[in-house]
Amino acid sequence: GVEAQVLSNSLNTMIDKINELLEQVKTEQIRLRKAEFELLQSQINPHFLYNTLDAIVWLAEAGEQKKVVSMVGSLSDFFRISLNQGQDILDVKEELQHVRSYLEIQQMRYQDILQYEICVPEELNHYQIPKITLQPLVENALYHGIKNKRGKGMIRIEGELDGEDCILRITDNGKGMTPERLEQVREGIRNRNVRETDIYGLYNVNERIRLNFGENYGITITSTYGEGTCVTVRLPQY
């Protein structure tokens, strides 16, 4: 009698717990799909595409054939990886190729103000990363950091191992953020209801990393006004 009752109660508790977990998984899957869909929408960004095509036409008219070929190749690579046959997770190596294509295009457009370096050790190449993690971070560095400063700006992408975790850093020597603005951005990255477009891109990147790999992973930001900004991406061994 009593033992059967205890067993029955335990089973009921366990079933409740399983249902709760299933509900949680379902909710997280929906959030992940939503984040991925919104990301894809942002990738098919008409401004970026039109501006790049404009630049290609301008180069062609100026007789810069080599640059035209190079830019068309970069644009093609950029969209090929963006739309990567529905795969949501890539190797770091492929993700770096994607962001390199983006930077090659932007460097041709902003050659007076943009330099970049990608320095990531090969041992990180096989780590897994949600597709289109780095490009939105680099875009932010360009449009909010580099374009708002005087003179030439530098964007660096570096990588290292921290224990078994993969660390990727995107650093710019742009305008940087005031402490108040930095706090706003950090809050926005954690807030599902963030409305500000500039912060939403960062929230989306962080959300997809956390939903794929867990709460211990994602992005963190440091910034000094007048000196620049650094975004750190942490990924697990997968």
Which role fits each region the language model picked out?
Residues 1-222, 228-232:
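Two-component histidine phosphotransfer core
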Residues 233-238:
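C-terminal beta-strand of the catalytic ATP-binding
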